[in-house]
């Protein structure tokens, strides 16, 4: 008869550190054709800004060339950029929304 071997049970814990997702700034860029009221509408509709917040961001866009609408994980930022650009084109405005790593 064979000899019964020792069975050793090894339990290994693997601890992985969950990294927070990379964050991205959603940016509206200035142009010479999109009305200021439309920019305010976009900020309220897509970024849930109050009229005062939207006006402040719109003025930053107008004077500084661009303004930050919000900071989001990549997937959300990418979706918001696509939605804003599509909405602008549907309304025949050249407003450009883009994203930058935060």
From Swiss-Prot:
It comes from the Bacteria. One of its GO terms (biological process) is protein catabolic process. SUPFAM superfamilies: ClpS-like. Pfam families: ClpS. Involved in the modulation of the specificity of the ClpAP-mediated ATP-dependent protein degradation. Belongs to the ClpS family. Binds to the N-terminal domain of the chaperone ClpA. This is ATP-dependent Clp protease adapter protein ClpS.
């Amino acid at each position: 008869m064979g000899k019964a071997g020792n069975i050793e049970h090894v339990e290994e814990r693997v601890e992985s550190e969950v990294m927070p997702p990379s964050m991205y700034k959603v940016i509206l860029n200035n142009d010479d054709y999109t009305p200021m009221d439309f920019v305010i509408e976009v900020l309220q509709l897509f970024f849930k800004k109050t009229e005062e917040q939207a006006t402040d961001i719109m003025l930053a866009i107008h004077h500084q060339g661009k303004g930050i609408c919000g900071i989001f994980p990549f997937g959300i930022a990418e979706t918001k950029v696509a939605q804003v650009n599509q909405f602008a084109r549907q309304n025949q405005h050249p407003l450009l929304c883009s994203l930058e790593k935060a």
